[in-house]
């Protein structure tokens, strides 16, 4: 009797650990559903929109300029940020101050990316904290799930490109 109960208990614990490991690998390496909060990505992503983020791109260095990514915040590692990739390592970026009076250039160092929100007037991004390490990127967002009226692939940046050629 006791042997049967212990056997069932160990099987249950084993299955729980096994499924927990499978779920962890799925969310860590494949992707998952994310709710974006804040106005920094408007109009592309509104506050409380639900999107799908895939994580394979970050593992295989498939992040490109124009991609929207989820990353660990450089100023608060407990929170995530949702921003668009403006520059990759080695790029020269045209940066502006919030008032748009002063324009300058910044270089993205090796192993880093330059992230900005689509809503430039209401976004804390690389213009404030500089380029972020590639290792902080958690995944690439490419599909909006909710609201259903916006269901589908995400559109290009409303700000156009701001790369410097000189």
Curated annotation (Swiss-Prot):
Q: Which cysteines are joined by disulfide bonds?
A: none
The answer on whether this UniProt entry bears the keyword Protease reads yes
**What is the superkingdom listed in this entry's lineage?**
Eukaryota
Principal location: mitochondrion
Q: What is its EC number?
A: 3.4.21.-
Signal peptide positions (record): none
Top-level EC class: hydrolase
Q: Which UniProt keywords apply?
A: Hydrolase, Membrane, Mitochondrion, Mitochondrion inner membrane, Protease
GO BP term, pick one: signal peptide processing
Say yes or no: keyword Lyase present: no
Active-site annotation: 40, 83
Where does it localize? Mitochondrion inner membrane
| Entry's Gene Ontology molecular function annotations | serine-type endopeptidase activity
Q: May I have one GO cellular component term?
A: mitochondrial inner membrane
Role summary: Catalyzes the removal of transit peptides required for the targeting of proteins from the mitochondrial matrix, across the inner membrane, into the inter-membrane space. Known to process the nuclear encoded protein DIABLO.
Family stated for the protein in its record: Belongs to the peptidase S26 family. IMP1 subfamily.
Q: How does it assemble?
A: Heterodimer of 2 subunits, IMMPL1 and IMMPL2.
The entry's protein name is Mitochondrial inner membrane protease subunit 1
Question: What organism is the protein native to?
Answer: Homo sapiens
